[in-house]
């Protein structure tokens, strides 16, 4: 039997119809009117009438406003990630959310206010397990959101019983501690939460008063917190005995042995806290070292669940973001400063925010003074500076008041400055893991970035070790129409840079700051 006429009018096809279509239209025109149905629910008194199966529309003209049909995704499967390499950089699929991880609504709202709407891979893996009370060792590349991975469950568990010092966060550098302090304050803004920052370079008396006031979370560097434990008295640090959660951020650096080790101070801090059987311990790092992995097998009390360990993109193939371009530039030892000046002045790099990493504080101090005389907008971050000046310089760089930050490895860990698109290794790092952390200051959270390493004749073995660590080879730096050697010869850059360097060294010998002001207590750099 022929198909009934649909209740909606059929658009007339302006093109030639097939023979099958003509037959179909002929049958429709000769059908008895009583056989027509205006809707599926219409009643028909003729029992012999049987509704046929619907046929596809005959017209090729679509109704206005009808959206194009899209193939449905298979049942139980999330929509595919649209960004190439999204999984590699730690971003999640569109269907994921913090609410699905059992995060409290007030925290979801706070994260949304901060434009953090979807959890990354490390956050999705760790947050549910931490909320269950498990100790955690989390490894994920730089810029993947490890701070939120431990801050959110800490704040959620604190909100259930907001009394006394609930958590302690230890981190190796003052700048990273300040950044974590500010992020925790922002996330906990809807609640009356009191964090406190305990770092070196500032007066201990206000810090002791703040500790005695029983803040809810303490963010500290190990050295300064250990000083308070040893010298500030029992009344000041007795609140630490009730801590329920401890976080070691950049755990590989905190637990490293050898010269400059922070391990003795970390042990002092942990000795003032409850035993491991009575608290939750979280370790996060971008480079999971054997010292960190060994903690998984340490003896545990019978009533504690096993340690949760996750390593997301921390092996050789994943330690460097896929959006990072790695290059090297061969430079002679005697003209390294001149090559750097020309490199910063090329058409592609002249306006890019950049961080220049040095191995020594004296090199960073000299480079800042020299580049300032060469008209670059530059500031610095290293241990020769007082803490107030370090904070001010970092704030200037974040606000784009300075385009270039010359720094030692104090700036290589944890600092999140989204505008940085270029990292220059003026000195090749001796440890390949330090290279991973340095170049991690750019190409964060899926953004693009470039890392350029200045390589001298004595640095070849160091570069090979770095390439083996990251699993990728560096390409030789090049820019269309740019020859650094040619510019050095033609433009007289060597003389200009030499004069700027001599003036900078003279300023250091006279004990003046970068603005030329006399400072009696300024350390001389020779």
UniProtKB/Swiss-Prot annotation:
Its EC number is 3.6.4.13. Residues 17-29 have a biased composition (Polar residues). A motif (Q motif) lies at residues 96-124. One of its GO terms (molecular function) is RNA binding. Gene3D superfamilies: P-loop containing nucleotide triphosphate hydrolases (3.40.50.300). It catalyses: ATP + H2O = ADP + phosphate + H(+). Residues 127-306 form the Helicase ATP-binding domain. GO terms for cellular component: cytosol; nucleolus. ATP binds at residues 140-147. It is found in: Nucleus, Nucleolus. SUPFAM superfamilies: P-loop containing nucleoside triphosphate hydrolases. A motif (DEAD box) lies at residues 249-252. Keywords: ATP-binding, Helicase, Hydrolase, Nucleotide-binding, Nucleus, Ribosome biogenesis, RNA-binding, rRNA processing. It comes from the Eukaryota. The keyword Transit peptide does not apply. Residues 1-77 are annotated as: Disordered. GO terms for biological process: rRNA processing. It is an enzyme of class 3 (hydrolase). Residues 338-485 form the Helicase C-terminal domain. ATP-binding RNA helicase involved in 40S ribosomal subunit biogenesis and is required for the normal formation of 18S rRNAs through pre-rRNA processing at A0, A1 and A2 sites. Required for vegetative growth. The Q motif is unique to and characteristic of the DEAD box family of RNA helicases and controls ATP binding and hydrolysis. Belongs to the DEAD box helicase family. DDX49/DBP8 subfamily. PANTHER family: ATP-DEPENDENT RNA HELICASE, ATP-DEPENDENT RNA HELICASE RHLE-RELATED. This is ATP-dependent RNA helicase dbp8. It comes from Neosartorya fischeri (strain ATCC 1020 / DSM 3700 / CBS 544.65 / FGSC A1164 / JCM 1740 / NRRL 181 / WB 181). The lineage of its organism: Eukaryota, Fungi, Dikarya, Ascomycota, Pezizomycotina. The gene is dbp8.
